[in-house]
Structures are given as structure tokens and as C-alpha cells.
């Protein structure tokens, strides 16, 4: 068994790309080795901003030998009557690179055929590895690549060196132009001791440690966590958990060192979200908090090196932050000179989407739709929701949001004039209306905020679908998937909103009257509803719910997602019922029979005529259905779907008996029609909850 180590030394790889590149390099190497038939025990991948590394442990010395049996023509076609080889036999032998007399004969169920076993000896690892390295190098999934120097090769950043060692011996490979191929590796750009020759992974690790490089990202993250907490504690503060920022700093540094900085206390008069946004998102600093969660005039920054006098570095970091905070203080003062409500006309000059008008028009639509939603769930908040919708986008034309786009909505909440107590409700709704911004993002806590958020997202979805703007593959420039998932989460959160989505989508469509959407109302609304169910299916699948359960509910054409999910949850429990498989099979059979009926004289909406019931099995089924029908409908109308399915489960025996003993398609029209109406009644009861015929029974 051998050890293979491969490092690509580069200029600084962007932090957002590094974790994925480390993972991809390991996976691509593993796949390439498997495809090449070169066995191994383990593939390990590591990386820092200036290097990507793969180590293959327990690598086999050579590929496995391959035997391939080639089958030629049938024996009777391979030789003529005199026993001489035909052109077919000669051609087959020539293709195998041998004479005809070297071919074998193989017996098959179809007769005797000529054959040849081609034996191919496996290549040594040193022969195979260069091709694997080239394959992996080209396949790394970078969002963007570049050329460097005068070469034509492309990579995310210029490649400086390549070190490839198989049991201490360099592997000759050509990956790109103007690259050093060497067994010497470099440590930290500033603290390293120059290039060091390595023989294996153990000596490589030692060279990295001596050269002030923490090779493993998890080690860098642990160092960052400990350093941040220690520095914050030194001034009596704490730091909020932020694994994303920890990981980003780990991808920015090779030797992370936590340093404590401070800023002038006068900046604490600025809203805390402005300060934390500037520190976290713009400078990658960790804000320091007091015990109550308020900001202290301190921050922790992660440097990429140690110096004899760290205060020099700290002053530099403080100077950069001060410039940011000076800008923020200026915008905070200037923006408040104009009332937020007075900025509404300015939105007329801001295009929201080329085909869908300005932000002013969107605000008008949002106000109307928010009022319509509130009228259904909280009439007392209709006026507040309308006001929040109308002014929700006004902060987009402020200086602060222009400088810090992440603060959209938040600054609107601060800038809204407080003329009465209810304005606090409006301000909070404006702050929350972009929520949730992603799959794991927090949801609005206020009812008014949820209403305005729904109005915003529904307006976006209906407008885009109405103009034929829909997600395709991986492209979703207007975030429609995110918007749909946001609507789903808003409706399904703990205190869900029972809303008729179809009616709301129709209302949203009509608000585009002056613009004129390209698609018709029915087509647009149906497209949006289908899109919701597609995202709902993905959302529930992520929670472990089988796709067929959603299909069974979607078939009912419901537009209340809270109700739809309640039905799905009942089906999840129903799957555990002993009668589940039999009842699913029965529903499929009933649906199949009824779908094939072509009889213009048959009206399935008529009730069952007890006088026409002849067989005891159909009489028993009709009686059992009559006994549970009212209870099933009552349970269903009150959202007690599990109880409704429990009542229906009791029908298993009589349904089985019916199909065992009764011929549905009787020659007598009256009898046949009555039996079909009985099946339609049974199927209709199940469809009070879901289309059970859509469910799937796992094969045993």
C-alpha cells in the first residue's frame, strides 16, 4: 500500500469558495480513483486560502488486472463446410489482435460461439495518477475562473506550485503553464520559513506547523472560537454565536489570531443593527455584547498573523471600522431630515422589474393586498397592515440602505414617524416584512408583519408568473422559490393563517390592471398554486414526508395550505394503520372502475337506492357507509382528519367482502348503476380527507 499526497499552491482563494472546493477535491479524487480501478483505503482533503490538499491513504500499487470476454460469430457462421474460417471469423480474430486458431469456443443457450478472453494488466499507480490529477484539476466546480501570466489554463486564482508525491517520489504531471512542480512546500506568506522539502504527509504536516499554517479548517475554527470568547471576556463582554462568521474567518486565514479592538462610544447612538452589519458583514468582525445583549464599544477581529506589536494591527482595523461608522452616522442624521412617509413619491423613479413597474406601484399593490389579507384574519389590523404595506419600501431610497442594503426594512422601522401608539405596530411590520429571507431564517413575530410579508411575496409571485417569468433549472433571479417557501412557512408556522390562496392570488392579479400581465388570470393563478404545491412537496420531503401523501392532497385542489398539511399529517399516521394497505388497494380499484364507466344514463351524484341492493355484501357495505357518513363529514369539516380516517378504516372488512362477493358491472342497468353509485359514495367519503387512490404501498 502506498501514500499519495497532492497540494495545489495558489494565490488567495475567495473565502466563500474554499469549503466547497476542499470537499469537491476529495470527492472528485475518490470518484476518479474508483473509475480508474485504483484501490485505496481513505481519501482526505484539507485546505487553506493558499492551498488545496488531497492525501490518499492505503493506495494500491497498481490497477487490478482486467479480463474481458469478447463474443464473436456463431460457430456455424465462423467456418465454411470445409472447416475454413469465414470472413466473419477472420474479422473477429483481427479485432482481438490474434489468429483464428487462438480463439476459444463458448457454449450458450443459443448455441456455440467463437470467443476470446482479452487480458489487460493493470497500470502502476504512478502511470494512472497524472491523468487523475488533470481530471480533478479541470473538474473543480468554481463559479468563476481566470487565466494568469501568458498561459491558457484557467483556475479560480493563479496557481503557484504543485507538489505531488507517491511514497516520497515526485509524480510527473502537467496541470497548467507557469507553475512550479516541486517537492518543496511553502508555509505562511509572512511568517513561514521559506520552502521546505517534504517526503510524505507526516513531514508535510510538520512543515505546515513550523511554517505557521493550520492546515485543517476545523482547527482554525476552534482557535477562532476560543480566541473570540477570551478577548470578549477580557472586557467583561460576550459574543453571540455566529458559526457562519467563524467559518468565513477560517477560510480567510491560515494562522488565525484574535485581537480586541474598540470604537468611540458616540457611535452607540446609531441603531445597533447598523453597527453589527458594518462589523459582521462588511469587516468580518465579531461585535462584543454586554450581559443584557446590548452592544459594547468593542469588537474582536481575526488577524492572519502574529506580530511583535499587535497594537499596530489593531489600530489599522479600528481605522477601517471608524470610516464605516462615520458614514453610518452621517446617513443616520441625514435620512431623518426627511419623513419616511414623504419618501413615497420617490419610489416612482425606482424600477422594481422592467415589465412590472416601479416600487411605487408595488407599494400600492402591497397596501391593497395586505388590507385584503388582514380583513380575513384580523380585521382590526386592516388599516395598519395597509399603511405598513404602503410605506414598506420607502427606506430603499434612503442613504443608509443605499450604503447597507442588508438593512432594508429594518431602517424603515426606525425611520417611520411615531404619531400614535399604533405606529409601533406598523414600524414592526415594516421591519419584519422581508422575513423569512431564506429556508432557515426567522419568521415575523407580529401578525401585521406576517400579513405584509405575505402580501409582498404573493405580489411578486403573481406578477412574475403573469409575465411568464418562472424559475428554470438552477436559475431563479427573482427568488421565486424562496418567496414561495416563505409563504408556506408563514402559513404553517405555529399559529398558522387559514387563508384561501386562490382568492388572494386572484386579488393580487387584479391589482396589476394598469400594467396588464401577459398571461391570463386563470393560467397565472393555477401556475402559482401548482408552484406552491411543488415547493410544499420539497418542504415536507425535507421533513421526511413521502411525496405520495402530498399528491393525495394536491389532487383535491385545495388552496388552504394549513388545511392541506393537516391532511398530510393525518395520512402519515394513517400509514401505520393495519388497514392502510387494503384500503389503498380498494381505493385504487374503485377509482379505476369509476374512471372507465362510459354510461350517459348514469348519474353518480344520486344516492344509493336501498331497494335495488340485492346481495348481502352490498347491503352490508351500504349500511356501514351510512353508519359512518355523518361522522366522517363532521370530522372533516372541523379539520379532524385523523378521526375521519379512523372511522373509514372500519370499512375495510365490508369493502373486502363487497369485492369478493359482488360483480359490480351487473347486466341489469339499475343494479349496476346502484353499485357504481355506492362505490362513488365510498370514494367520496375518503376524499373528504384525501385522494387515497394516489397513495403508494411499498413492495414487500
From Swiss-Prot:
GO terms for cellular component: cytosol. It is found in: Cytoplasm. SUPFAM superfamilies: HD-domain/PDEase-like (SSF109604). The keyword Ligase applies. Keywords: Aminoacyl-tRNA synthetase, ATP-binding, Cytoplasm, Ligase, Nucleotide-binding, Protein biosynthesis. GO terms for biological process: arginyl-tRNA aminoacylation; glycyl-tRNA aminoacylation. It catalyses: tRNA(Gly) + glycine + ATP = glycyl-tRNA(Gly) + AMP + diphosphate. Disulfide bonds: none annotated. Its EC number is 6.1.1.14. Pfam families: DALR_1, tRNA_synt_2f. InterPro entries: DALR_anticod-bd, Gly-tRNA-synth_bsu, Gly-tRNA-synth_heterodimer. One of its GO terms (molecular function) is ATP binding. Tetramer of two alpha and two beta subunits. Belongs to the class-II aminoacyl-tRNA synthetase family. This is Glycine--tRNA ligase beta subunit. It comes from Magnetococcus marinus (strain ATCC BAA-1437 / JCM 17883 / MC-1). The lineage of its organism: Bacteria, Pseudomonadati, Pseudomonadota, Alphaproteobacteria, Magnetococcales. The gene is glyS.
